[in-house]
Amino acid sequence: MSAQVMLEEMARKYAINAVKADKEGNAEEAITNYKKAIEVLAQLVSLYRDGSTAAIYEQMINEYKRRIEVLKELIPADGAGNGNGKHSQVSVDDLVMKEKPKVNFNDIVGLEDVKEALKEAIVYPTRRPDLFPLGWPRGILVYGPPGCGKTMIAAAVANEIDSYFIQVDAASVMSKWLGEAEKNVAKIFNSARELSKKDGKPVIIFIDEIDALLGTYNSENGGEVRVRNQFLKEMDGLQDKSENFKVYVIGATNKPWRLDEPFLRRFQKRIYIRLPDIEQRKSLLLHYTSKIKMDNVNIDELAKMTEGYTASDIKDIVQAAHIRVVKEMFDKKLEQPRAVNMEDFKEILKIRKPSVNSEVIKVYEAWHEKYKAL
């Protein structure tokens, strides 16, 4: 598994554990897990500061920190966990990304079908709403295995249409107070509509790991059902033709099967971000190897050898091959590293396997065939 994907999955695990404890009123355990998630996300920011998702990681860190402060107010001095601190009312200003995402469609290698689907659903209606008398999709679900660029594609859309970008997750909505979580959902959507109306700019509400917030689970309480119902109500409100708000909801998930059918119907576009095919792998390899010195590397052969690898995996393979020759330079006390050759890639592929199991891909394919909506 690639380092970035591994860290993202670790942060996600801690965040899910934090939200679970949060829902159960266990503030101390929630704080512990939010802090662990922050530590991992901070590592991601440090390692991938120049990456297109660094700003999103930082946004998540800030949201988890805010949630920790709220939870601390709920813990009395004796640590019993039943304090009467302030309610968890979401501040939408804190969820709006202050800086425009740096990534655009040109930065995304491959995924042409995905980009075209998003242009049809969001870019064209935003630029020429007069050409869409029947309206256009307001809900877009992007799904697929980790490491295939779901978060990056959402950020790129926001850049393409110069929109406000509101990032939402379970931590920003959660509350132990009865009725507060659904009020938070309503507040997010109301603020998005007000922003769009005031400035005439589109607004994207991006919900990462949407299954954690709105998926169906065996052990859930009435509050989670109410949040889902409120969300469905707000999604229906976006379709009101009497109000031409340019507000879109993009949900991203690695587990689309956690979402029930009434919820899926609100997402008129359901876009599967697959593992890269051979042409996309070739494009990815050309893109990443353009930054390093190479000698006698057959990109076509390498593209065949990397079948089953994610885009993130391929980046890590190129990085590992380059690190291999740098290590050799230090070991042999040379002045400069030699060029990376085909043998370097073959050696790396012996010790780096795809981060996504082929059996899991079959599950994605089966779900896609049943629910696809491009």
Curated annotation (Swiss-Prot):
Domain (MIT): residue spans on this chain: 11-73
Gene3D superfamilies the record matches: 1.10.8.60, P-loop containing nucleotide triphosphate hydrolases, Phosphotransferase system, lactose/cellobiose-type IIA subunit
SUPFAM superfamilies reported for this sequence: MIT domain, P-loop containing nucleoside triphosphate hydrolases
Induction description: Induced around the genome segregation and cell division stages. Down-regulated after UV irradiation, indicating division inhibition in response to DNA damage. Expression is highest in dividing cells.
Chief localization: cytoplasm
One example GO MF annotation: ATP hydrolysis activity
InterPro entries: AAA+_ATPase, AAA_lid_3, ATPase_AAA_core, cell_div_CdvC, MIT_dom, MIT_dom_sf, MT-severing_AAA_ATPase, P-loop_NTPase
Cytoplasm found in the keyword field: yes
Domain notes for this protein: The MIT domain is involved in interaction with CdvB.
This protein's name: Cell division protein C
